[in-house]
């Protein structure tokens, strides 16, 4: 039934999109007078963005933003030919994306050492991407649809409500433009990778513009018996009747018939001991399914009443279905001859809605300029699911012999069967927030506060039980920045975050919310007249009432407090007309405090103490552009008890692009490009959740692209 629904809805939208270019052709001449939206929504150029909307929900120059913000531009994503948001963030300081190694099913991002709720810190076009991190129903946006990615570091609850303390990842979709622009790509690579993508935008009339973007991806993976398959399309329509009013309608339709692999191997077999193959498959072919169908419909409305008052409203509706069957290992048995294995199954349907209303006023009191923002937002999701669990026959990973694929309802493997529960997981949040950005000469003071009401509910229809929790919480943020005429802007800030109890404990009771606070000092430098941007930030961040996932189980356990202290350095520089550089360094000291599980003073998993990266893009002449990068991830712990370290690793990437129009005028706009990641094909462990659950890093990837820009 759902397949019929998505096909029918997609057919309607695609039919409308196909009609739009015909309408534009019907007008011989179109004089465009409407202006585009906020500057931070406009297409980026090169490797450096100059503004951000994510930090304050208003257009704000980065040089005047008293917070550490990194922006990944469209140019960077194209040059590096990224296939996931995780991959797009590989060269961003303060960000660790190695959670699942070569697996690409989810975009899981740790910021400043915090990964709890790691799929709940992503936003699309200003609204939270409403996934259910307590299930397998988690959304993923293809980076081909994105114009930019802003990483807002540090607690952000004063504007966004619930968030992890390390920050949020703000994805901005490509918008319709009133000028004609098109892109077409064909990519082929190892693991039978095949990608076809297109993107076209144009004006229909003086006040209407459209955009149609689509992509299909198909490939094998580095893992045996695994494939990835995706079909996605994103039509959008923009109406601007005058320079003060705009309405943008969007849809993002995505079908993933095969979501590839998402499992791991023990540390004994990857970090040490008899090493397993990177392609090792711990499952069973007759229980190996991951399908995801997601639809996101949204709109953005804005109106400027006069020179003082303006209003904005963003809203989205999301529907996502996920089907999963997976047999996976959970560590060695007592004599290390066989791997214990488990089974998980899920059939879930998620519906979500979010809306954000913003009233902005540009005022002046005496010599002080004020930009005041008053907002009211609401979000909710409901995920109805059938959750299956069982024990599977153990596996000898070196011979591939498991003794069969029978599933058992008991750990003694005596009773064939599956344990099934019918669940409903619900969450809603409503909040009101107020922000005042004050400017007096070169001083910039920002004060913001928010009050939230959050309700979580877990219903087990099988056990006829309900666990419900309601929390009210106030969050705040304050920052002060001084902007020197030389382009130097030092700042200091304080911010808070609330992370609600979406996660159950071992008894399926909801845990209490986690609260956080951060102190940050930093400096931003932008040479006058330059687009280059340099920044440094020092922070001290503490999260209380921490909950960690008990991998490979799906419940969470209390772990006390976590304190993160660190330094982030970033440079995005246009060194010359031909050379662009992105450089970053992260030092992150993360420790458990007041831990109740014996780990006090230890470092959590997924928190490398040092990370560094460098990417350089050089225009060599004759239409040749060469890019090269190096990424270093320092040592990290394989378990919270700190009994074993994950070794550090260094990876190299490269790209070469040839613009064919330089050699033949008839080929203007055409190009060929080669991208190689992990050039040395280094075999490494990217990260571990525990000593039983470590992820092999991605193998070497070689992809060749033929493209045409017009």
UniProtKB/Swiss-Prot annotation:
Bilayer topology annotation: Multi-pass membrane protein
Q: Name one GO cellular component term.
A: cell outer membrane
Keyword Transmembrane carried by entry: yes
Q: Per UniProt, what is one GO molecular function of this protein?
A: siderophore uptake transmembrane transporter activity
Where does the record say this protein resides? Cell outer membrane
Give the keywords, sorted.
Answer: Cell outer membrane, Ion transport, Iron, Iron transport, Membrane, Receptor, Signal, TonB box, Transmembrane, Transmembrane beta strand, Transport
Coiled-coil annotated residue ranges, if any: none
Motif TonB box location, chain numbering: 28-35
Residues annotated as domain TBDR plug: 61-174
The sequence motif named TonB C-terminal box is recorded at 693-710
* Keyword hit for Signal: yes
Residues forming the TBDR beta-barrel domain are 181-710
Matches recorded under CDD domains = ligand_gated_channel
Ranges annotated as spanning the membrane: 29-37, 65-73, 91-99, 106-114, 137-145, 152-160, 180-188, 194-202, 208-216, 259-267, 271-279, 293-301, 309-317, 353-361, 370-378, 427-435, 443-451, 476-484, 491-499, 517-525, 531-539, 555-563, 567-575, 579-587, 610-618, 624-632, 649-657, 671-679, 684-692, 702-710
Q: Which residues form the signal peptide?
A: 1-26
What's this chain's function? Ferrioxamine binding and uptake, in association with the TonB protein.
Q: Which family does it belong to?
A: Belongs to the TonB-dependent receptor family.
Q: What is this protein called?
A: Ferrioxamine receptor
Q: Please state the gene responsible for encoding this protein.
A: foxA
